[in-house]
């Protein structure tokens, strides 16, 4: 694995948080291509991949979290739809920091 990559459990958050402020001060939009990460700088672009189905999406870090171990990322509801894990709620995902 590349030094800018990680693998771990990702989850999603969505409609219940719509309109609330994210950690960087934006209003959360469940359809936006955004994610929460505990340490990466805001506005970092991350390719999140679901190895189970081969889907991937580029997301922008705009929030902090997840706060549940051992999860490594929370993605927006829209991103989870595109990655194909809304029903499961969790996925073992691959994260690759871009740029």
Report each predicted region and the residues it spans:
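Secreted/periplasmic proteins
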Residues: 1-99
């Amino acid at each position: 694995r590349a030094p800018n990559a990680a693998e771990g459990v990702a989850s999603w958050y969505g409609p219940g948080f719509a309109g609330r402020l994210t950690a960087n001060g934006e209003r959360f939009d469940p359809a936006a291509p955004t994610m929460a990460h505990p340490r990466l700088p805001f506005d970092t672009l991350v390719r999140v991949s679901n190895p189970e189905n081969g889907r991937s999406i580029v997301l922008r870090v705009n929030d902090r979290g997840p706060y549940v171990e051992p999860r490594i990322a929370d993605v927006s509801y829209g991103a989870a739809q595109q990655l194909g894990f809304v029903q499961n709620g969790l996925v073992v995902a691959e994260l690759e920091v871009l740029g």
